[in-house]
Amino acid sequence: MSEIILDTETTGLSVKDGHRILEIACVETENLIPTKRVFYKLINPEREISADASRIHGYTYEILKNKEKFADIAKEFKDFIADKKLIIHNAPFDISFINSELTRLNLEKINIKKNVIDSLEIARSKFPGSSNSLDNLCKKFNIDLSKRTKHNALLDCELLRQVYINLVGEKEPSLQFKHCLLYTSDAADEGLGVDLGGRRI
């Protein structure tokens, strides 16, 4: 079964305040093993970035002002995720931002009930009363966080893949395939690569 592990970074916490997506990553997997197909973009959010958000992911408008706008990448994004289940941690947050961007362009929104698996919901059902942030789940499952000095959508997709495997009781993927390095043009430009055996390069 094909899935897409998806993560975004944004200019702030809520679309209601006009905040927008500035980074999006989608990693295709087959039975949770990466296929080497990746969609990754840094995006000009067309607005300033809140100081709190910038502290989390490290991006500023100055860094992103010459990147593509969401309108420029929307079709490629929609084509990439078409007919795939999306695995997202705290899905309502990411989907609210994605659907806000799609609505701006009069494009069909993502149906969160039909097309999305929320790993946070699964974690809350398995570990009620615990903090189930991505960081805390990585610690719980002994997943290496040493490279996560800032939030990064591409790296976080790989961390989420490993967390999700543990949540659903699958075999550790590093035993099933050799390390493979994923790059996209934006990732290469920013010096970002993710070794899908769990190391970021």
Model-predicted segments: where are they?
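Conserved non-catalytic scaffold segment of RNase H-like nuclease domains
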Residues: 1-114, 124-127, 134-151
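Short, flexible loop segments at boundaries between secondary-structure elements
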Residues: 120
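Acidic two-metal-ion nuclease catalytic site recognized across multiple nuclease folds
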Residues: 166-185
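Conserved small/polar residues in nucleotide/adenosyl-binding loops
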Residues: 183-188, 201
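A short, hydrophobic C-terminal helix/tail in secreted or cell-surface proteins
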Residues: 186-196
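Acidic, divalent-metal-coordinating active-site segment for phosphoryl/phosphodiester hydrolysis
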Residues: 152-163
